[in-house]
Amino acid sequence: MIPSDHFVRFYNEIFKFLENKGHEHLEDYFLTISRHQETHCLKQFSEGGLQGMYDYWMVIKKEENCDSDKFIEDGQYGKVLKSFMSGCPSLGKVQDNDAGACPLYCYHCPGWILPIMSKVGYYYVYDLISLDMPRCQATICEHIEDARAQLKMVLNRHKGDRSLVKWNFPEED
């Protein structure tokens, strides 16, 4: 088995290669990752809902040594799972080498997660914060109105810069 230090650096080089061929190649790769991830989490997410998602990511937190906090709370319309990553080990490892990070490295997380959230019927707002800091925030909502309120807040924080925010639902009906 390849050590995670090598894996994330290899991933990074694949991302750079594909982006160099054209952004659509990188997007297609993220969708391929998403399809493969379904075997690991689709059933748990669809049957366990937000608690199943929380349980899945708590295992990942331990396995990957993530500096993150997650909690489920009440939104205005339904339950919401919030995630705050204050130390992403994956991006940290990619930055800690002389090859340089793919400028879009962080996009792989929403790239695989958003399609799965759509399949299980949850609304996802992913705030990348900055592409060169190993930090991000995510909110997963049962109800679209909670997600729209979160999206509005995140877009306001980024002064309308949509490049650092990813979501899987229409902003308006």
Tell me the role of every PLM-derived stretch.
Residues 108-109, 113:
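ATP phosphate-binding glycine-rich loop and adjacent ATP-lid/helix-beta elements
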Residues 1-107, 118, 123-173:
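N-terminal accessory segment detector
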